[in-house]
């Protein structure tokens, strides 16, 4: 038989709201920890008197009764877990776990039974419903009616406001059944009645929330705040935690009382009661009890006469009456030596206190965040002009808290504190405009594998390559229309005609030099474009026969473990699967990772070997291709070098232009159409006719003409 039993996702009903938590059964007793509030129920094994198993709305439930009349109910068990629990109760608690069914007839008449702190409405021997009397806030009576009103839970979507019972009259003389019913309820109900004298009174205390000065009257079961406008009665059972926090100026102290449910002022709810004290203010306090009562009730924690600082007296009395520890700041010390950090939350500035088990911010609005609620924290820069940073906290429920305007000098201390508490740090990247000097705020999760991020990087690379390829393609279209050989011919044709009478030889020489320089410049630009085009074609023309790159150790492990993760988490999405795999990989030990590192190393060696073989084979084929290309180019050059028929002036100009032709132009693609060639022939014939018309007659012709 196991020494302990643990159950997750167990629910406890708290004033109409179902709070999940974790239940642990051991030989010493039963412990339930509320996941939302962190409150712990500890039931000693010797206090248990009865255990009941029954069907409820959330599966099956466990009802436990103790010797002092307390009742604990936990729901969310499966039917198959009954035998395991029954054997555990018999072995360790010597109790029989009884099965009991609820009545579902739907009748509205029956018998009311009071047992411990429960009111049970029964039909026959079966209970219909039960009301915890500690949830009753008010009990009023009528002629034949009793009305119960309840404390409200702000977290409950639907709340039960009141229940009204009709109590029929009886024939017994001297007994009022309505009054008897009401007295049974009031004896166990959490109804605040300021009867008797207060144990002590603190006058005119400064309260930050709710704002004002209040007289605090301490009663045995509740705290009474009496102000000029409002009165609050706070039962000690609603106090969750107590905090005593030193102000940054070292002259004041905060005393914070965490409440659940909160006190209300109109539509405003106050989850925290914050008192502000001066360290220099002292008080002498006398309790309104005799010494024997003080000793018996508080067991040495308080004495009848006490004196000291006002904040010490208030905190000491509250600790004794509420019976809860006072939380103080831990070992954290900021840059200025204080145990807190000055920052802003929402629209107000305040103080953030790093505690041993959480963070608390005071005072407007006060915020308390436990470490077990935190999903991750983040350090981020606010703007470029301020020397400050933001500290962000996101809870597991998705709520985000941003504490801004923290001095840069506090960064190191806060970062070390967060690391020491082993909180997850997720840096979302520094905001735009950050100086290079702020690299201190780099992400601490560099080693964490993010499959989604890697996939996005790969897609970005592919898009960038496609963009480059498309730009190169557009460049090729413009390059094809640029044929340097043809342009040179056009330039040469401008000088085909013999010098006209109006042009000088010097001007012609200078024009030729300028044209030559321009042609050289164009040739160089074309060569650069062609080289860029070739490199882009090499990128595009990826050989499908080339060896594939080896996978990393993580990817090898992921491919082998993907099906197992899917089976362990049925219905998981692809994104969540990658995220889950990254978490599992990060949590793996070095010994387990070494196996996949070896496989990755073997794959890398095989890739390098295959790459060498592939490069060797590709080198031979490329050499053959190059020799073929050289032969083709040589043949074209020989073909072009043969002198064309025509006038001597035209051939000389053609030779001049050919002297500036590069190898690239000689081997350019033969894209000139026959139509362009015919146009040029017609243009050359017209030029020759113009030359004949414009040439002056020779001396011999003129002489013969004169003779005629």
From Swiss-Prot:
This is FACT complex subunit SSRP1. There is a cross-link at residues 90, 296, 364 (Glycyl lysine isopeptide (Lys-Gly) (interchain with G-Cter in SUMO2)). It comes from the Eukaryota. GO terms for molecular function: chromatin binding; DNA binding. Residues 458-708 are annotated as: Disordered. PROSITE patterns: HMG_BOX_2. The gene is Ssrp1. Transmembrane segments: none annotated. Residues 625-634 have a biased composition (Basic residues). Residues 695-708 have a biased composition (Polar residues). It comes from Mus musculus (Mouse). Residues 547-615 bind DNA. The modification N-acetylalanine is found at residue 2. Interacts with MYOG (via C-terminal region). Component of the FACT complex, a stable heterodimer of SSRP1 and SUPT16H. Also a component of a CK2-SPT16-SSRP1 complex which forms following UV irradiation, composed of SSRP1, SUPT16H, CSNK2A1, CSNK2A2 and CSNK2B. Binds to histone H3-H4 tetramers, but not to intact nucleosomes. Identified in a centromere complex containing histones H2A, H2B and H4, and at least CENPA, CENPB, CENPC, CENPT, CENPN, HJURP, SUPT16H, SSRP1 and RSF1. Interacts with isoform gamma of TP63. Interacts with FYTTD1/UIF. Interacts with SRF. Interacts with NEK9.
């Amino acid at each position: 038989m196991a020494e302990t039993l643990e159950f997750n996702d167990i629910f406890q009903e708290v004033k109409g709201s179902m709070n999940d938590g974790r239940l642990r059964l051991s030989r010493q007793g039963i412990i339930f920890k509320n996941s939302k509030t962190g409150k712990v129920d500890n039931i000693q094994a010797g206090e248990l008197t009865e255990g009941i198993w029954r069907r409820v709305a959330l599966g099956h439930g466990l009802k436990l009764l103790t010797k002092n009349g307390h009742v604990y109910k936990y729901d969310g068990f499966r039917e198959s877990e009954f035998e395991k629990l029954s054997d555990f109760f018999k072995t360790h608690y010597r109790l029989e776990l009884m099965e009991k069914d609820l009545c579902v007839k739907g009748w509205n008449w029956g018998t009311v039974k009071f047992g411990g702190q429960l009111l049970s409405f029964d039909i026959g021997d079966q209970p219909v419903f039960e009301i915890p009397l500690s949830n009753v806030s008010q009990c009023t009576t009528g002629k034949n009616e009793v009305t119960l009103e309840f404390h409200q839970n702000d977290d409950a979507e639907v709340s039960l406001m009141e229940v009204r019972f009709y109590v029929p009259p009886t024939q017994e003389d001297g007994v009022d059944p309505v009054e008897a019913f009401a007295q049974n309820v009031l004896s166990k109900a959490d109804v605040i009645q300021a009867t008797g004298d207060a144990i002590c009174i603190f006058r005119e205390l400064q309260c930050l929330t709710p704002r004002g000065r209040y007289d605090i009257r301490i009663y045995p079961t509740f705290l009474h705040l009496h102000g000029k406008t409002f009165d609050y009665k706070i039962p000690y059972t609603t106090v969750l935690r107590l905090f005593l926090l030193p102000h940054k100026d070292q002259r004041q102290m905060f005393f914070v009382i965490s409440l659940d449910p909160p006190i209300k002022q109109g539509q405003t709810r106050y989850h925290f009661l914050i008192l502000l004290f001066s360290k220099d203010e002292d008080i002498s306090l006398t309790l309104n009890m005799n010494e024997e009562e003080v000793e018996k009730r508080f067991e040495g924690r308080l004495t009848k006469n006490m004196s000291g600082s006002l904040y010490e007296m208030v905190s000491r009395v509250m600790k004794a009456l509420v019976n809860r520890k006072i939380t103080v700041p831990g070992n954290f010390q900021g840059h200025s030596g204080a145990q807190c950090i000055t920052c802003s939350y929402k629209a107000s500035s305040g103080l953030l206190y790093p505690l041993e088990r959480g963070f608390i911010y005071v005072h407007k609005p006060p915020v308390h965040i436990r470490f077990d609620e935190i999903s991750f924290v983040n350090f981020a820069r606010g703007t470029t002009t301020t020397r400050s940073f933001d500290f962000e906290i996101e809870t597991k429920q998705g709520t985000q808290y941003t504490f801004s305007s923290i001095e840069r000098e506090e960064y190191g201390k806060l970062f070390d504190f967060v690391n020491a508490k082993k909180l997850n740090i997720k840096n979302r990247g520094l905001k735009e405009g950050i100086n290079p000097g702020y690299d201190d705020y780099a992400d601490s999760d560099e080693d964490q594998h993010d499959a989604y991020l890697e996939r996005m990087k790969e897609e970005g690379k592919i898009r960038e390559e496609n963009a480059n390829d498309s730009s190169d393609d557009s460049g090729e279209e413009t390059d094809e229309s640029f044929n340097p050989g043809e342009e040179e011919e056009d330039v040469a044709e401008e000088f085909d005609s013999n010098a006209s009478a109006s042009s000088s030889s010097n001007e012609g020489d200078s024009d030729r030099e300028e044209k030559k320089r321009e042609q050289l410049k164009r040739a160089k630009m074309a060569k650069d474009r062609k080289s860029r085009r070739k490199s882009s074609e090499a990128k595009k023309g990826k050989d499908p026969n080339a060896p594939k790159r080896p996978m990393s150790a993580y990817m090898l492990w992921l491919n082998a473990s993907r099906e197992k993760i899917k089976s362990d988490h049925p219905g998981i999405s692809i994104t969540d699967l990658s995220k889950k795999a990254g978490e599992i990989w990060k949590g793996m030990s070095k010994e387990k990772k070494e196996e996949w590192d070896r496989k990755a190393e073997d794959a890398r060696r095989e890739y390098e070997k295959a790459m060498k073989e592939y490069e060797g084979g590709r080198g031979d084929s490329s050499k053959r291709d190059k020799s073929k290309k050289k032969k083709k180019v040589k043949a074209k050059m020989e073909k072009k070098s043969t002198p064309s028929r025509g006038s001597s002036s035209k051939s000389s100009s053609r030779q001049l232009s050919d002297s500036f032709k590069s190898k690239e132009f000689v081997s350019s693609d033969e894209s000139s159409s026959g139509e362009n060639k015919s146009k040029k022939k017609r243009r050359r014939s017209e030029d020759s006719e113009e030359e004949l018309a414009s040439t002056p007659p020779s001396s011999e012709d003129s002489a013969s003409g004169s003779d005629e």
